[in-house]
């Protein structure tokens, strides 16, 4: 159940959000903040290419603040081949080109902080894209230093190691001819 924090109970509904809400610094923000998730691809397009972007998000921060938003939960914006809506990250240190640049991100973050809005990044660390440099390296040989970053198994009776299924259907195991082994891909 959500809670409404009001300084003036009888007039709270008639006042703008910023006048009746307890300031963020008085809250345990991770428990009491109003969080708004943004899927950047469809949120706000700043350059007319039909794809939402970081500059588009920045342009709407004041409006989100007026709505009473304390925290933005930002869906993945990292570099990705985008086979899984950005959850297949190929570079954790860069922004997907269609969303902008690292400079655009820094500007959006600075503006959010200026307005007292926190940003929580959706950081996917339990899997990466098959185009991530670590995975590309792990495929090169069985003794590659990156090999243990991923789950590799020998074939069982000439087939997948087990009957596990991928979240999107089909086997969770993909055969890799280079080392004659299967790697696990749940997505």
Residue locations for each model-derived region?
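Acidic/aromatic-lined carbohydrate-recognition and catalytic surfaces
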Residues: 24-187
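Short, Lys/Arg-enriched N-terminal segments with co-localized hydrophobic residues
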Residues: 5-23
């Amino acid at each position: 159940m959500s809670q409404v924090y009001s300084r003036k109970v009888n007039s709270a509904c008639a006042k703008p959000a910023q006048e009746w809400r307890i300031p963020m610094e008085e809250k345990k923000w991770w428990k009491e903040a109003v969080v708004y998730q943004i899927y950047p691809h469809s949120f706000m397009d700043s350059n007319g290419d039909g794809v939402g972007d970081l500059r588009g998000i920045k342009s709407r921060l004041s409006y989100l603040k007026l709505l009473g938003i304390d925290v933005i939960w930002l869906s993945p914006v990292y570099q990705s081949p985008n086979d899984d809506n950005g959850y297949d990250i190929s570079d954790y240190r860069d922004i997907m080109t269609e969303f902008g640049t690292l400079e655009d991100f820094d500007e959006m973050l600075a503006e959010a902080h200026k307005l007292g809005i926190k940003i929580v990044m959706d950081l996917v660390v339990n899997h990466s894209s098959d185009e991530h440099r670590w995975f590309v390296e792990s495929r090169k040989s069985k003794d590659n230093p990156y090999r243990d970053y991923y789950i590799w198994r020998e074939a069982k009776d000439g087939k997948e190691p087990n009957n596990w299924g991928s979240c999107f259907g089909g086997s969770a195991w993909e055969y890799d001819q280079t080392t004659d082994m299967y790697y696990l891909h749940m997505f």
